[in-house]
Amino acid sequence: MEYRIERDTMGEVRVPADKYWGAQTQRSLENFRIGTDRFRMPLEIIRAYGMLKKAAARANLELGELPEEIAKAIIQAAEEVVQGKWDDHFPLVVFQTGSGTQTNMNVNEVIANRASEILGKPLGSKYVHPNDHVNRGQSSNDTFPTAMYVAVALALHQRLYPAVEGLIRTFTAKAQAFDQIVKVGRTHLMDAVPITLGQEIGSWAAQLKTTLAAVKEMEKGLYNLAIGGTAVGTGLNAHPRFGELVAKYLAEETGLPFRVAENRFAALAAHDELVNVMGAIRTLAGALMKIGNDVRWLASGPYAGIGEITIPANEPGSSIMPGKVNPTQVEALTMVVVRVYGNDHTVAFAGSQGNFQLNVYKPVMAYSTLESINLLADAVASFDAHLAQGIEPNLERIEEHLQKNPMLATALNKAIGYDKAAEIVKKALKEKKTLKQAALELGYLTEEEFDRIVVPMRLAKPHEGA
């Protein structure tokens, strides 16, 4: 491998000749060999940083803080970072300084060297300087949280929201299709009064809508950016209008209403907005756990379980039991949920660890949140495509359970009273008879009266037509 010499304030460093990074990135590579292959800084952060550095160069150009030639080269190089052209030039891990300084400098060095190259200058020449030009008016302390918020907001819009909204559409369609299928309701894991299969699946769609709306509400906090606060929130070394312009340009590029945080001291010292978003994502994940559990119970069997719905058989379920079909998509989804719960704890605890003017757990907060978004998006899309869209009713089993359901007697309360209805249920269960047989033998109702009162669909939709 060929090397070139890069320099920083600590001296000379050998850097691979074909890489755009510089001395500080190389030092970080050598000093933080922690999870190198498994915990790389997410590319979402790198791309967001590219947007930020482009916006910063535009702002500095407008404010007369950078020469036009330098600014335009930075803008071009930063756009190449956004497009993913230099992804393999960002090798650093999450576990570095808690302010994300090494990643900020990795981005600064790559853009500076690429911009210098665009202007016909050799790598390492610092014709475009990583600190004086690319990082002008900035600190790692305000740029990393800015890139973090931009990255998470974009990941929500590009990954999580479409996946969950797709599953909501699937459940809504299934709810409409199965609206006339009456089945046993269940509370406390015990038989209860009837509902329709459509009502049951419709409740899943409603729960997802509610929890997704909460994520979207919490996302609004991410629009408040730390940029312009520089090292401690005072804005030292930044033009007074710099942060405002950067936020404006980021809003233009992303289509999201980014703005400068009202209090940039708080924006550096705490990241409660991200903690709130992650908490809402965890709540959404909890809804998916509930739905997944419902699905696997309803599909359990085929003979010794509930078996009221069927799900697609995507692959053999067992290496020893021939013909077995397992709810594998549910199991994958719920394992992701467990991971998200762990990540939420990481983000919540990390968010509590700000000291004075800076929280120094930013990279792990960013990584954990982005991992949760990406895992959930993938798992929900997989669950939707390979399971939810293939849910079908097992009409024979549904009817069998419905006819045996003693809770149909609830419909008799108004006609004969709670006590007599309970007596009918006890007799039916003890003597293994239908409710109708028990009611007739006790003489509390005629056959005509029973048939008129105990209508399962009317129990499931008592107010329809009212």
UniProtKB/Swiss-Prot annotation:
Entry's EC annotation: 4.2.1.2
Location (main, coarse): cytoplasm
Positions contributing to substrate binding: 99-101, 129-132, 139-141, 187, 319, 324-326
Recorded metabolic or biological pathway in which this protein acts: Carbohydrate metabolism; tricarboxylic acid cycle; (S)-malate from fumarate: step 1/1
Pfam families in the record: FumaraseC_C (PF10415), Lyase_1 (PF00206)
Keywords linked to the UniProt accession: Cytoplasm, Lyase, Tricarboxylic acid cycle
Catalytic activity entry: (S)-malate = fumarate + H2O
Organism domain of life: Bacteria
GO molecular function: fumarate hydratase activity
GO biological process: fumarate metabolic process; malate metabolic process; tricarboxylic acid cycle
Site, as annotated: Important for catalytic activity: E331
Location within or outside the cell: Cytoplasm
GO cellular component entries: cytoplasm
InterPro entries reported for this sequence: Fum_hydII, Fumarase/histidase_N, Fumarase_C_C, Fumarate_lyase_CS, Fumarate_lyase_fam, Fumarate_lyase_N, L-Aspartase-like
Active site: H188, S318
Family from the record: Belongs to the class-II fumarase/aspartase family. Fumarase subfamily.
Protein task: Involved in the TCA cycle. Catalyzes the stereospecific interconversion of fumarate to L-malate.
Record text on subunit structure and interactions: Homotetramer.
NCBIfam families: fumC_II, PRK12273.1
Note: There are 2 substrate-binding sites: the catalytic A site, and the non-catalytic B site that may play a role in the transfer of substrate or product between the active site and the solvent. Alternatively, the B site may bind allosteric effectors.
Protein name: Fumarate hydratase class II
Biological source species: Thermus thermophilus (strain ATCC BAA-163 / DSM 7039 / HB27)
Protein encoded by which gene: fumC
